[in-house]
Amino acid sequence: VRYISPPVIIGFTAGIGVIIWVGQWKEFFGLPVLPEGHFHQKLWVLLQSFSDINPAVTAVALVSLALVVVPKWLPYRLGRIPGPLLALVVMTLLQAVSGFEWLPTIGSAYGDIPRALPAFQGLSWEYARWFELLGPAVAIAMLGSIESLLSASVADRMAGTRHNPNSELFGQGLANIFSPLFGGFAATGAIARTATNIRSGGSTPVAGIVHAVTLILIVLVLAPYASHVPLATLAAILFVVAWNMSEVPHALALFRRAPRFDTLTLLITFTLTVFVDLIVAVCAGVLLSRLHLIPWLKANKNTNT
C-alpha cells in the first residue's frame, strides 16, 4: 500500500465519492425506484425516474444540505459545530414533532432500532466447518486489510498525518476476532466515514472512541429518536461527504500540472472504481505506476554501473 501513488489515491477516492453521490439520489429527491445492479444500470434507472421527483422530500434534503454547509461561514465558536451533527439534530427533532408521514425515515424504511446490545453467541466447535471457512476468512482478512490501509492513506492525505500500519491491522484484527462472538461480522476502515470524521475535525484516535460511545448511546438510549432521522437528511450529509472525498480542486490542479501519464493513471483508476471494482482499480493503478517507473529504474541502474 505504501507504493500507491497520489494519482491512484485521488482516482479511487473520487470514484468512491461519485458512487456515494449517485447512490443517494433516491433518498435526496424522493425517487420512487429501487435501483439495482451495476453502477451504470443504477444510474440509468435513476435518470429515468427524475420526472417523479418528490418536491417536499427534496425541500427537506436542501434544508439539510444548507445546515451541513452553513456552519463553515459562521463565527469561530459557532463554526466549530459540525454541520452534519447540526443537520441531524434539527431535522430529526422537526420530524419527531411534526410526524410527517410522507417523509421516509430510518424507522419507516428499516424498522425500529433494537434497544439492547448483541448477546454472546459463543463458538461453533464443528472443526470441519472451520476448515471449510478458512479460505474465505483469509480472503476477507486480506481485502479488509487493504481497504483499511487505503483508508488510512486517504486520511493521511486529508489530515497531514502518518499512520502506523502495524497498529492499524493489529487493532482491526483484534476487533474482528471478538466481533463474531456477539453476532457481528468483519469490519474495516471505511473511507467515507473517515473522510466525514476528518472534515468534521476528528483527526485523532479519540474520534473513533467517540464514534463507538455514540453508537452505544444511540442503541441503549436514543434509539426511539434515531428512528425519526429523515433519510433525506442522511442523503444530504453524504452529498457533502462525496464532494469532500472527490477532491475536485486537487484533481483539477493535477490535470493542469501533472505529467500526462499521471493524469491517465488517475482517469483509469477513477473509471475502474466507478464501473468495475475498487480492488481492481487499485491493482490497475499500482501496476501502471510501477510500469511508469521501469524506464527510470533502468536508467538509474545503468548510471550506477
For each of these PLM feature ranges, what is it?
Residues 1-304:
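Transmembrane helical cores of multi-pass ion-transport proteins
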